[in-house]
UniProtKB/Swiss-Prot annotation:
It is found in: Cytoplasm. Its main location: cytoplasm. SUPFAM superfamilies: Ribulose-phoshate binding barrel (SSF51366). GO terms for molecular function: 1-(5-phosphoribosyl)-5-[(5-phosphoribosylamino)methylideneamino]imidazole-4-carboxamide isomerase activity. It comes from Erythrobacter litoralis (strain HTCC2594). CDD domains: HisA. The keyword Amino-acid biosynthesis applies. The active site is at D8, D129. This is 1-(5-phosphoribosyl)-5-[(5-phosphoribosylamino)methylideneamino] imidazole-4-carboxamide isomerase. It is an enzyme of class 5 (isomerase). NCBIfam families: 1-(5-phosphoribosyl)-5-[(5-phosphoribosylamino)methylideneamino]imidazole-4-carboxamide isomerase (TIGR00007). InterPro entries: Aldolase_TIM, His_biosynth, HisA_bact_arch, Isoase_HisA-like, Isoase_HisA-like_bact, RibuloseP-bd_barrel. Belongs to the HisA/HisF family.
Length: 242
């Protein structure tokens, strides 16, 4: 199981939000590329980056920071946030991003996502971000009437690399990952699932790793790392054993 340390970008700074609320941002640094290298030094080979400004605006607002991260980080960068057209997808892949996460466009234009998945083999991840079990879009500001499982089924056999499941109500709060909902989603689909939202420590990593055989491909963690509650090297080692 892959452990993805997270770098969320707002105004060029490294931040974490509480429940996706841009007004509840905690700043953890002003040098995203340097933070990426700290994660690399701890053994990270995979990195999850989110352009928060882009998620709300629908276009990249932290391009310079993302470019610096991709240039410096020696591993695999997964990027999401406001990527909603083919030009943006192609641009990021050409820059060196390994995987693109698409959320809002996946709900509103699933054919676009399927087209991108065909064009960029193993390169597209669909974000299934949920508030109380319903898909949320536009930087989590809008909640739909589409259940998580229904959203996932739209992309069965479409060539999507993975599903990224986030329980918004836990994100950035250190309440613990919603393991039951994550595992249930993995059981309902043939696509690998990446867990996100609320990771508070090594126990979450351990329990998720026990379900790797059921399709849990990875887990994203941010605040627990920045606040010293989770040792990244230990988490990576635990994930590697699953």
């Amino acid at each position: 199981m892959i452990v993805f340390p997270a770098i969320d970008l707002k105004g060029g700074e490294v931040v974490r939000l509480a429940e996706g609320d841009m007004d509840r941002a905690t700043v953890y640094g002003d040098n995203p590329a340097a933070q990426a290298m700290l994660f690399a030094e701890a053994g990270a080979e995979h990195l999850h980056v989110v352009d928060l400004d882009g998620a709300f605006a629908g276009e990249s607002r932290n391009r310079e920071a993302v470019e610096a991260i991709v240039a410096e980080f020696p591993g695999y960068v997964q990027l999401g946030g406001g990527i909603r057209d083919a030009t943006a997808v192609e641009g990021w892949f050409n820059l060196g991003v390994a995987r693109i996460v698409i959320g809002s466009a996946a709900l509103k234009d699933p054919d676009f996502v399927k087209e991108m998945a065909r064009e960029w083999e193993n390169g597209i991840v669909v974000a299934v971000d949920a508030r109380d079990g319903m898909i949320a879009t536009e930087g989590w500001a809008e909640v739909s009437d589409v259940p998580v499982a229904d959203m996932a089924r739209r992309f069965e056999d479409a060539g999507v690399a993975s599903l990224l499941f986030t329980d918004i109500g836990r994100d950035g709060l250190l309440k613990g990952c919603n393991i039951d909902a994550t595992v249930e989603l993995a059981r309902q689909t043939d696509m690998p699932v990446i867990a996100s939202g609320g990771v508070k420590g090594l126990d979450d990593i351990h329990v998720l790793s026990l379900h790797a055989h059921e399709g849990i491909e990875g887990v994203i963690t941010g605040r627990a790392l920045y606040e010293g509650r989770l040792d990244l090297a230990a988490a990576i080692a635990m994930g590697a054993r699953s």
